[in-house]
Protein backbone atom coordinates (compact mmCIF):
# COMPACT_ATOMS: atom_id res chain seq x y z
CA UNK A 1 0.00 0.00 0.00
CA UNK A 2 2.13 2.80 -1.18
CA UNK A 3 0.67 6.16 -1.91
CA UNK A 4 2.11 8.37 -4.55
CA UNK A 5 3.04 11.69 -3.07
CA UNK A 6 3.24 14.75 -5.20
CA UNK A 7 6.24 16.96 -4.60
CA UNK A 8 5.30 20.04 -2.64
CA UNK A 9 5.68 23.36 -4.39
CA UNK A 10 5.96 26.71 -2.75
CA UNK A 11 3.36 29.42 -3.36
CA UNK A 12 5.81 31.43 -5.45
CA UNK A 13 6.54 28.47 -7.69
CA UNK A 14 2.86 27.61 -7.96
CA UNK A 15 1.99 31.17 -8.96
CA UNK A 16 4.58 31.27 -11.73
CA UNK A 17 3.67 27.84 -13.05
CA UNK A 18 0.30 29.10 -14.25
CA UNK A 19 1.59 32.40 -15.62
CA UNK A 20 5.19 32.09 -16.80
CA UNK A 21 5.07 35.56 -18.37
CA UNK A 22 4.86 37.05 -14.85
CA UNK A 23 7.91 35.21 -13.61
CA UNK A 24 10.06 38.31 -13.52
CA UNK A 25 8.04 41.26 -12.23
CA UNK A 26 10.57 43.86 -13.37
CA UNK A 27 10.48 42.62 -16.95
CA UNK A 28 6.68 42.66 -16.86
CA UNK A 29 6.64 46.23 -15.53
CA UNK A 30 9.08 47.43 -18.17
CA UNK A 31 6.98 45.72 -20.84
CA UNK A 32 3.78 47.36 -19.61
CA UNK A 33 5.41 50.80 -19.41
CA UNK A 34 7.10 50.38 -22.76
CA UNK A 35 10.57 50.88 -21.33
CA UNK A 36 13.58 48.91 -22.47
CA UNK A 37 15.48 47.81 -19.35
CA UNK A 38 19.21 48.38 -19.24
CA UNK A 39 21.49 45.44 -18.59
CA UNK A 40 22.54 45.14 -14.95
CA UNK A 41 26.17 45.82 -15.92
CA UNK A 42 25.16 49.32 -17.05
CA UNK A 43 23.63 50.02 -13.66
CA UNK A 44 26.73 48.85 -11.82
CA UNK A 45 29.20 51.04 -13.70
CA UNK A 46 29.58 54.43 -12.07
CA UNK A 47 31.14 55.84 -15.25
CA UNK A 48 28.07 55.03 -17.35
CA UNK A 49 25.58 56.81 -15.07
CA UNK A 50 25.41 59.78 -17.43
CA UNK A 51 22.26 60.25 -19.50
CA UNK A 52 22.42 59.10 -23.07
CA UNK A 53 21.75 61.85 -25.61
CA UNK A 54 18.23 61.90 -27.02
CA UNK A 55 17.64 61.38 -30.68
CA UNK A 56 16.27 64.32 -32.65
CA UNK A 57 12.77 62.84 -32.97
CA UNK A 58 12.59 61.95 -29.27
CA UNK A 59 13.72 65.45 -28.36
CA UNK A 60 11.05 67.05 -30.55
CA UNK A 61 8.35 64.76 -29.17
CA UNK A 62 9.26 65.63 -25.57
CA UNK A 63 9.43 69.32 -26.44
CA UNK A 64 5.91 69.15 -27.94
CA UNK A 65 4.58 67.44 -24.82
CA UNK A 66 6.12 70.09 -22.58
CA UNK A 67 4.75 72.88 -24.77
CA UNK A 68 1.24 71.37 -24.65
CA UNK A 69 1.45 71.18 -20.85
CA UNK A 70 2.49 74.85 -20.67
CA UNK A 71 -0.38 75.92 -22.91
CA UNK A 72 -2.99 73.88 -21.04
CA UNK A 73 -1.80 75.08 -17.63
CA UNK A 74 -1.82 78.70 -18.84
CA UNK A 75 -5.35 78.28 -20.18
CA UNK A 76 -6.48 76.75 -16.90
CA UNK A 77 -5.16 79.67 -14.85
CA UNK A 78 -6.73 82.21 -17.24
CA UNK A 79 -10.05 80.43 -16.99
CA UNK A 80 -9.88 80.41 -13.21
CA UNK A 81 -9.06 84.12 -13.04
CA UNK A 82 -11.76 85.09 -15.53
CA UNK A 83 -14.44 83.03 -13.80
CA UNK A 84 -13.80 84.41 -10.31
CA UNK A 85 -15.39 87.68 -9.35
CA UNK A 86 -16.62 88.96 -6.01
CA UNK A 87 -20.25 88.86 -7.15
CA UNK A 88 -19.97 85.22 -8.21
CA UNK A 89 -18.35 84.36 -4.91
CA UNK A 90 -21.16 85.89 -2.85
CA UNK A 91 -23.87 84.27 -4.96
CA UNK A 92 -22.35 80.80 -4.83
CA UNK A 93 -21.66 80.94 -1.08
CA UNK A 94 -24.95 82.27 0.20
CA UNK A 95 -24.62 80.07 3.28
CA UNK A 96 -22.98 82.21 5.93
CA UNK A 97 -21.04 80.94 8.91
CA UNK A 98 -23.57 82.56 11.25
CA UNK A 99 -26.12 79.88 10.28
CA UNK A 100 -23.82 77.05 11.24
CA UNK A 101 -24.45 75.54 14.66
CA UNK A 102 -21.24 73.64 15.33
CA UNK A 103 -20.22 72.30 18.72
CA UNK A 104 -16.86 70.61 19.18
CA UNK A 105 -16.14 68.19 21.98
CA UNK A 106 -12.48 67.79 22.82
CA UNK A 107 -11.46 65.03 25.13
CA UNK A 108 -10.85 61.35 25.56
CA UNK A 109 -14.17 59.70 24.75
CA UNK A 110 -12.89 56.33 25.95
CA UNK A 111 -12.37 57.70 29.46
CA UNK A 112 -16.00 58.55 30.26
CA UNK A 113 -18.22 58.00 27.27
CA UNK A 114 -21.49 58.43 29.17
CA UNK A 115 -20.67 62.09 29.89
CA UNK A 116 -20.03 62.77 26.21
CA UNK A 117 -23.16 60.91 25.12
CA UNK A 118 -25.21 63.06 27.51
CA UNK A 119 -23.67 66.23 26.03
CA UNK A 120 -24.37 64.93 22.52
CA UNK A 121 -28.01 64.22 23.40
CA UNK A 122 -28.39 67.72 24.86
CA UNK A 123 -26.95 69.25 21.69
CA UNK A 124 -29.36 67.26 19.51
CA UNK A 125 -32.37 68.34 21.58
CA UNK A 126 -31.23 71.99 21.37
CA UNK A 127 -30.90 71.69 17.60
CA UNK A 128 -34.40 70.17 17.39
CA UNK A 129 -35.79 73.08 19.42
CA UNK A 130 -34.09 75.60 17.15
CA UNK A 131 -35.53 73.83 14.11
CA UNK A 132 -39.07 73.90 15.56
CA UNK A 133 -38.74 77.63 16.24
CA UNK A 134 -37.70 78.37 12.67
CA UNK A 135 -40.46 76.16 11.25
CA UNK A 136 -43.07 77.98 13.31
CA UNK A 137 -41.84 81.32 11.92
CA UNK A 138 -41.99 79.91 8.35
CA UNK A 139 -38.38 80.98 7.91
CA UNK A 140 -35.89 79.03 5.84
CA UNK A 141 -32.91 80.04 7.96
CA UNK A 142 -32.83 80.97 11.67
CA UNK A 143 -31.14 84.31 10.95
CA UNK A 144 -33.58 85.46 8.25
Swiss-Prot record:
May have an RNA/DNA binding role. Residues 67-99 are annotated as: Disordered. Testis. Coiled coil: none annotated. It comes from Rattus norvegicus. It comes from the Eukaryota. Residues 72-82 have a biased composition (Polar residues). This is Testis-specific protein TSX. Transmembrane segments: none annotated. It holds the Pfam family TSX.
